[in-house]
């Protein structure tokens, strides 16, 4: 199995996936606020991707089936970025963000196995 990266990702090999914890229901606002914060601080080149993984669920209500679009990981946002220590306050100070997921709230990048299981990267066989 081989991971295929886009041109943008190849230019930023040190970019890694991190998970941010957010207030419930603030995931989309956090995404917009992070993009804005990176732009205002002229570091948008360090931000590769922000994702809120969604899934379609079939619900049955009153005998009718309906497809509902739901967050796979409520209260979490996945961010691929080039992380540096000076960004910690920028990210954790973003409205809606409660912190990084990791031991003692320290930014911990996802492992290759976690990235594969979450299907965050394009993979070819």
Regions found by a protein language model. Give the residues of each.
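Acidic-enriched and Gly/Ser
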Residues: 2-125
């Amino acid at each position: 199995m081989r991971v295929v990266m886009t041109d943008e990702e190849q230019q930023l090999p040190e970019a890694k996936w991190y998970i941010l914890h957010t207030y419930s229901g603030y995931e989309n606002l956090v995404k917009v606020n992070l993009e804005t914060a990176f732009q205002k601080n002229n570091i948008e080149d360090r931000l590769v991707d922000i994702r809120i993984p969604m899934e379609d669920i079939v619900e049955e209500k009153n005998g009718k089936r309906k497809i509902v679009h739901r967050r796979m990981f409520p209260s979490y946002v996945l961010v691929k970025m080039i992380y540096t220590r000076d960004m910690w306050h920028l990210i954790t100070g973003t409205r809606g963000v409660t912190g990084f997921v990791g031991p003692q709230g320290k930014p911990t990048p996802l492992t290759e196995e976690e990235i594969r299981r979450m299907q965050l990267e394009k993979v070819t066989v």
